[in-house]
UniProtKB/Swiss-Prot annotation:
It is found in: Cell membrane. This is Lipid II flippase Amj. Involved in peptidoglycan biosynthesis. Transports lipid-linked peptidoglycan precursors from the inner to the outer leaflet of the cytoplasmic membrane. May serve as a defense mechanism against naturally occurring MurJ antagonists. The keyword Nuclease does not apply. It comes from Bacillus subtilis (strain 168). GO terms for molecular function: lipid-linked peptidoglycan transporter activity. It comes from the Bacteria. Pfam families: Amj. Keywords: Cell membrane, Cell shape, Cell wall biogenesis/degradation, Membrane, Peptidoglycan synthesis, Transmembrane, Transmembrane helix, Transport. Pathway: Cell wall biogenesis; peptidoglycan biosynthesis.
Length: 269
């Protein structure tokens, strides 16, 4: 059986899109602080997170079907396929970073429309997906330039936040994949292992909400109120997205050990 199949490529593109959306979600806070509408920016951020989470749930049955089709030598084949999918997460995150400056400008307009349209997300999407909306969006597209790193200092990088977000991203990236692989390692407890994926992703989401999001949100508020410089929020956001790349790379190392840990953990349920 071939490792790279049409279905694997489909899931690869799906994960690429999911991680691009999650990376670009960080642009909403930058945009909100830029135009002074933090609450509206948070609303747009929540929409993007919900879309990415829902998309992640949609791809899970397709990923699970890879195991059903693996046949003989499933551990080796599925292991290679899942590593390729994790690579898709890395590519998607890098794509999100490349598009970040463009989407900061794009989301700034979207947030203004959201605030001016009475908080109607539907109206924002209707304008955004119109013919004129596409033309306007294309005018904002630009590749990152060397000027984007102007004013950079190492002291602007919140190192603890980088490590925390990297670990959380790695857990979230392999949550479903390690759980499915654990089902192959312990076939007699495969259902228990697969169901554990929801718990793992739930814990990762909770850690993100407790340790990462509040710090970035408070910083965005301070910038909007003029208490701190915009450059601090900019480099905190850059820290977050680069730590996401590091997290997806760390996920390659954690994938198999994570699967064995889940397989062992299922003994206690």
């Amino acid at each position: 059986m071939h490792v790279i199949t049409t279905q694997v490529l489909f899931i690869f593109c799906f994960l690429l899109l999911i991680h691009s959306i999650e990376t670009l979600a960080y642009a909403t806070r930058l945009s909100g602080a830029r135009v002074g509408f933090i609450a509206s920016a948070l609303s747009l951020f929540n929409v993007m997170v919900i879309v990415s989470r829902m998309s992640n749930m949609v791809q899970q049955p397709f990923t699970g079907h890879l195991i059903d089709d693996a046949g003989k030598n499933a551990l080796a084949i599925v292991g290679e396929q899942f590593r390729f999918l994790i690579f898709g997460s890395t590519v998607g995150t890098i794509l999100g970073i490349i598009l970040l400056p463009s989407f900061v400008a794009l989301f700034s307009r979207a947030i203004i429309h959201l605030a001016g349209g009475g908080g109607s997300v539907f109206q924002v999407f209707r304008k955004g997906f119109s013919k004129q909306g596409f033309k306007n969006a294309l005018s904002y597209l630009r590749l990152p330039s060397i000027s984007y790193v102007k004013g950079f200092h190492m002291r602007l990088i919140p190192k603890r936040l980088f490590v925390i977000n990297m670990l959380i991203t790695s857990i979230y990236t392999i949550g479903v994949l390690s759980a499915l692989y654990a089902g192959l390692l312990a076939p007699e407890r495969s259902t228990t292992a697969v169901m554990a994926s929801g718990l793992i992703n739930g814990i990762a989401t909770m850690l993100l909400a407790i340790f990462v999001d509040p710090k970035v949100s408070v910083l965005a508020d301070d910038v909007a109120k003029g208490k701190r410089s915009y450059i601090y929020l900019k480099w905190t956001s850059v820290t977050m997205v680069t730590s996401r790349v590091a997290g997806t790379l760390l996920a390659q190392l954690m994938f198999i050990p994570g699967a064995y840990y889940i397989a062992w953990l299922t003994k206690w349920f």
